[in-house]
Amino acid sequence: MSESEQLLEKQQDHKWDAATHADKGITIKTGKIAVSSSDIPLRNRKGLLTWDQLEPWQQDNQYIISGYRPPSFSFYLCVKSIFHVHNESVNIWTHLFGAIVFLFFIFKSELILKRDTTTAEDVYVITVFLFSAFTMLGCSTFYHTISNHSDDVSKFGNKLDYLGIVVMIVGSFIPCLHYAFACHANFRTLYIGTIIGIGVIVASTCLLDRFRQPEWRPYRALIFVLMGLFGIFPVIHALKIFSFSEILVRMGLVWLLLQGLFYIVGAVIYALRIPEKWSPGKYDVFGSSHQWFHVCVIIAAFCHFHGVCIAYDYFHERRGCGEM
């Protein structure tokens, strides 16, 4: 660690001590909310900041009253904070765990692609999904780790976080569309090309500064949900070609529906800011809406993973298009 980083760490420790020993009579006011800092458990405040002590660029959810890391202006200190408890801890560790799991399968894809009839196309489409999941979870982990660095770095990380979501949605579609329309190449190309085009448009929107503003929270959730709901069209199309029972395994449809359910539930919780909206200050470190959103995303990603594996197995059990 350089001398400048050591100095920054000492300055940060001083800020944390100041926050810890702040007058117990302080009252935090956020809109119509008024919460006394004496009501916030000391374990949640030690070395951390409260809402009213934040810089404007750090303020996003007024119902999260405490547990904020001070601006660090140091990537080293941001990474070091991973091993401390604060209101980003759950967000960081849930998606870090998921990123590690998907990275493992990227390098150990033979654990999934076990069929003798596996082709280069199988390797490609499944690797695309695994990489997209890793990208989304990795970008999310990165953003929540460095979100307290500085205004500019936080903005960059936030945009990267949203781009990761777009990559995940597009990457999730590709293996499902590949196996659903494996024997209908024109339809497969049409749907894959369409979702990639939609992804480019949404990604461009994510780069706009206004997209990350707190008032855009419900619109962000809606845009990503609508992007995912594009999947309704190829499913309806596939039902006109195949029986419902066949679609269940050809696309791993049950698991895709479960994935969609968890994504939608997570997005609704995220947009409505529940449960912290009902009891500001109670869910600052554990149990806030963003944390539940992260849990839903992890579960959804693994549901989709299982569905893709079912589609892969079914395709090779039927020996490709030979028996279709």
Swiss-Prot record:
Cytoplasmic topological domain: 1-91, 144-162, 210-221, 273-291
InterPro entries, per the entry: AdipoR/HlyIII-related
Localization: Membrane
Pfam families given in the database record: HlyIII
GO BP annotations listed: fatty acid metabolic process; intracellular zinc ion homeostasis
Transmembrane feature ranges: 92-112, 123-143, 163-183, 189-209, 222-242, 252-272, 292-312
KW Cell inner membrane (keyword) present: no
Keywords linked to the UniProt accession: Fatty acid metabolism, Lipid metabolism, Membrane, Receptor, Transmembrane, Transmembrane helix
Superkingdom to which the source organism belongs: Eukaryota
Keyword tRNA processing (UniProt): no
Membrane topology: Multi-pass membrane protein
GO cellular component: plasma membrane
Recorded family membership: Belongs to the ADIPOR family.
Stated name of the protein: ADIPOR-like receptor SPBC12C2.09c
